[in-house]
């Protein structure tokens, strides 16, 4: 299971993990005095399920080529993504979450690729992420078929997108 309790803590059940994701996200928004709490409260179970049960990912190697991809097309919900990445062990620390929406932080107002470990695409305007996720999925199919013709079965990732 991807979500593991932090050191010196008891085993966490699914509901508690989802509640932790929600509380962290809401605390981030409250501390920044800016953000969108609705998506944090509503979509936390979806991200928990994706990251904890379905996605093929490795928090220790967030750029592994054959990993599944997740695109938060509703980029304004970044507090949800960051709190999920924190709970899943992608290298974010509580101090990073406290720096939410601050200049030069690992947790900017909208997800930014190559800034935050585990963010597969920079998003902002609604709909931008959806179109790019379609392109990522098409690229996967193309690469899988290209390498299969050469008798190499090495590409088999999936692309997930949350639209808002």
Regions found by a protein language model. Name each.
Residues 12, 37, 123-126:
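Conserved, non-catalytic sequence blocks in retroelement Pol enzymes and Pol-derived host proteins
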Residues 18-34:
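N-terminal capping segment at the start of a domain
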Residues 42-164:
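Cofactor-binding active-site loop characterized by glycine-rich and histidine/acidic residues
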């Amino acid at each position: 299971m991807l979500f593991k309790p932090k050191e010196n803590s008891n085993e966490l059940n699914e509901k508690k993990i989802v509640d932790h994701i929600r509380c962290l996200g809401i605390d981030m928004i409250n501390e920044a005095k800016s953000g969108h709490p609705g998506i944090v409260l509503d979509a936390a179970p979806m991200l928990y399920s994706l990251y904890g049960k379905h996605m093929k990912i490795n928090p220790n190697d967030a750029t592994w080529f054959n990993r599944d991809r997740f695109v938060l097309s509703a980029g304004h919900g970044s507090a949800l993504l960051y709190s999920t990445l924190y709970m899943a062990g992608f290298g974010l620390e509580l101090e990073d979450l406290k720096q939410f929406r601050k200049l030069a932080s690992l947790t900017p107002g909208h997800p930014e690729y190559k800034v935050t470990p585990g963010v597969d695409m920079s998003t902002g305007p609604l709909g931008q992420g959806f179109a790019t996720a379609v392109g990522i999925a098409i690229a996967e199919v193309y690469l899988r078929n290209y390498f299969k013709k050469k008798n190499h079965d090495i590409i088999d990732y999936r692309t997930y997108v949350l639209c808002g």
